[in-house]
Amino acid sequence: MKIIEYEERYLEDVKDLLVELEEYILTIDKDELDQLHPEYREKMAILDLKELEENNGKCFLAVEDNKAIGLIMGTIIQYDENDYLDYKCPKSGEITELIVTTKIRSTGVGQALMNKMEEYFKYLGCEYIFVDVFAYNQKGINFYNKQGYHPRMHIGIKKI
């Protein structure tokens, strides 16, 4: 297994990985608000990659036997002029996606992807890395906790 920067020849694998992640989210979404729209597979990867391009981001792939088996995407957080009113706004990266195909989870692939993204953010001079994790994704939360991440915000939801 090797970690490489995204190459277009792996686009179909990226689409498959993002669908796998969304399908997993659907199984744990107690609020039943997530969905896998018929256009998700064709559009989501393109939208994510465009966001990376616009925000000095990167996508790294874990590749084995010429197939992407995991990915991580991250961008540089863009602050606006009003953010500075109540926040110090240190240069920070944000992990926007992380998925390792089910068959090889817990084999170190996620850790290798995290290490590569953290290395990239450090290279750019980031002081912090943010990550949003779906509240019902306990496996994801546990993984990030093991990597030294801790909760900073809590977003609640209530059906009315």
Could you describe each region identified by the protein language model?
Residues F121-D132:
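Conserved GNAT acetyl-CoA-binding A-motif
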Residues L61, K67-I76, E94, I99:
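Conserved beta-strand in the GNAT
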Residues E23-D48:
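Conserved GNAT-fold acetyl-CoA-binding loop/helix
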Residues M73-G93:
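Conserved acyl-donor/pantetheine-binding loop and adjacent beta-alpha core of acyl/acetyltransferases
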Residues F130-G140, I157-I160:
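Conserved beta-strand-loop-alpha-helix junction that forms the acyl-donor binding cleft
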Residues K2-I28:
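A short beta-loop-alpha structural element at the N-terminal edge
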Residues I104, G108-K116:
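Conserved acetyl-CoA pyrophosphate-binding loop and the N-cap/start of the following alpha-helix
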Residues I46-L61, E94:
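A short helix-loop-beta-strand connector motif used in the catalytic cores of GNAT acetyltransferases and
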